[in-house]
Amino acid sequence: MSRYEVDGVDIQTLPKVSLHDHLDGGLRPQTILELGDEIGLELPASDAASLGAWFAAQSNSGSLPEYLKTFDITTAVMQTEHGLHRVAKEFVLDLAEDGVIYGEIRWAPEQHLQRGLTLDAAVEAVQAGVEEAIGLVASHGGRIRIGQLVSAMRHLDRADEIAQLALRHRDRGAVGFDIAGPEDGFPASRLQSAFDTLAKAHFPATVHAGEGAGIDSIADALYSARALRLGHGTRIAEDIVVEEETDEAIVVRLGQLAEWVKDRQITLEVSPSSNLQTGTIAQWGTALTDHPVDLLHQLGFCVTVNPDNRLQSGTTLTRELGLLVEAFEWDLDDLEQVTQNAAAGAFCSFDEYEELADEIADGFDDLR
């Protein structure tokens, strides 16, 4: 049982969908210790609890570049088939334990070639771990669906190659494409040819935008990359002007980009704790109650809630939802809405979506 409840219901027992969850940000500290020992990696702590605390402390910098440096350690232990397989398997098992029924694992294969793996071998190792975990969950009477989001690093020059990699594995685990890494100064349009290739192949893309940069980056992701979802997307709130606010109501004016994102129901992959750690919401404040996620949700944007990097943020999807219940007095209806939003944004077939949506509705109804 978790410590997070909504309307008397343990949030961990609710069916959940996780769209923005990085493989190299979801390792168990004990696994890092063991895999690190195998390769002689020097670590900042020698026990799991202390190592987990170190990651959390390092991640509370308020700077996205500093936050990203913690991945030097996690990716170091994910350079072999064995390491990738184990991390992927445990990643899925941890999602299932948290009540996730559909999850997408995003990761950048080009970051995992230091010990001789090929791009294809890396993707295959992750898929093998995913499938083993799905089988283990099923053997215990559970069910979880998982897809890979194959990411390219936006500041490097392998996006065309990674796009082709994603297409090669589209029927073997890969469900979408993403670009990650430092956002400011590296717009999606820099990788235009990769997105053109994907669009011509009818392969969906989500793009990190509205995290480390503002609305220009979001616009570029939508128009140049044809993004169906925005990784974070939080800073779309920069295009919303609050004209009047009382205890009973709030009057706002949406800019053209915000209107487009709302009217087209572009999925926002909001990650509350991560946004605090990286300074994404600094212009609005430094507390979770300052986060524009509630405003976006109340205005009818397609908000989803995600953990981003469970290790760095010391979090789970249950915790992220629970924090919003505490900060904004969200109820079961709010949690069901953002969960259904996530199901609608999932990179799965329409038939799979309908099944997923029914499972979510039934799961919430059973707990009311």
Model regions: which residues?
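Metal-cofactor-binding active-site regions of metalloenzymes
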Residues: M1-F203, E211-R229, R235-R368
